[in-house]
Structure formats: C-alpha cells, structure tokens
Amino acid sequence: MAKLTKRMRVIRDKVDVTKQYDINEAVALLKELATAKFVESVDVAVNLGIDARKSDQNVRGATVLPHGTGRSVRVAVFTQGANAEAAKAAGAEFVGMEDLADQIKKGEMGFDVVIASPDAMRVVGQLGQLLGPRGLMPNPKVGTVTPNVAEAVNNAKAGQVRYRNDKNGIIHTTIGKVDFDSDKLKENLESLLVALKKAKPSQAKGVYIKKVSLSTTMGAGVSIDQSGLNAVAN
C-alpha cells in the first residue's frame, strides 16, 4: 500500500468524508488545507439526477459568476468588419479570420477562449480537429457563437464559466480562488447552481441536484450541505 504523504495525512485527519459541511465551514476548511505554493482554485463537482446516456438529458451552458474566477482569460475572436473593431475594444487579444486560422494551424494558441460571429464559422469549421480536443471550439449553446462578439468577450473577461456534464452526469468547473472571501465563493456557487437549475432537462425526474462537493486544486473533496445554500430547491 502506498505511503501517505504528510499533506495527505493532514487532509485525512481533517476531512470527515461522511459529513456534509455547511458552506462557510467547508470554505474555512479548504482555506486551512490549501498549503500549495500557489493560489489554488476552488473547484466544484455537482452530481445531477440525469441519465447522461440520453442526449436529451445532457446539461450544457455557460454563466457569468458575480465575482469572477480569479483567472486572467485570453480571448481569440473570429470575426470581421465592425465586429472586429468591437471585439478589440472589448479587450480580445486575438482578432481575425483566415489570418487567425493560419496562426492556429501553426500551433500558435495563446488563448483560453475562442469566440466567433456566425459568418466566421466557415473559417472556424476547418479548425475542429485542433480546437475540439482542447474544448475551444465555439458553440452557440455556451454563447461563443454569437453576432454580439463584444458582449461575449466581456462575459469571458468578467468570469464566465462553461459547464457540461460528463458521462456520469457530473458537472465540473471552478468558482474562484482559495484567497476569495468566503461570501464571494458562496455567491459564485449559488449563481452556478441557479444556472444549472435553469438548464434542467424536462425529461430529468426526481432529485436534480443530488450532491455538491468543493475541492481545491491540490486538496480533497468536501461535501456541501445544500440546505445552507439559497439557490438550491430540488
């Protein structure tokens, strides 16, 4: 059996895996256990009451967290004309059409989000094999294919998170950094849960939000008592 590291022993001793923690208690515990030499992200896993094998029960979308994610986001926009100027004014780092596609084909991908206006999809469509595996392919379901590229850039810069359930019906995303105030992390979490509730498939039956867990980049998961969250009502 592998020997536990000192960090793992501390986590094992501090975290009760059978307990559902009040959100404030959970955040305090995560902060205490976040001892990495960098500012760890606070990640959330939400178990949904869906059948992920059925396409009409899959959950996908995006929402802007009220306090952002604490990450600096670099944005590439495929568009032209007035939209190109609007995207630049909104703060996009990369704006173009075929010229931007050529950069990507050369392996130059210094961005975190790709946005496209509908007329640019003829160019973006050629990049599926490069952007798709990295989760960067623009999609109207998450607001990254839109005629209003400036708004999409603003959302990305403001702390928009995209979510999509995995094959087990679990949503994984981030809600901030461990150095955020507890209230900000709670409000970001509640904002995400509100968005997930709005995205509930009509075919999903029974309890929808089954379990909510928080963790830091290098830490263990802490199960959250949903009764302490304003956003949750199954």
UniProtKB/Swiss-Prot annotation:
Pfam families: Ribosomal_L1. The keyword Ribonucleoprotein applies. CDD domains: Ribosomal_L1. Part of the 50S ribosomal subunit. Belongs to the universal ribosomal protein uL1 family. Binds directly to 23S rRNA. The L1 stalk is quite mobile in the ribosome, and is involved in E site tRNA release. This is Large ribosomal subunit protein uL1.
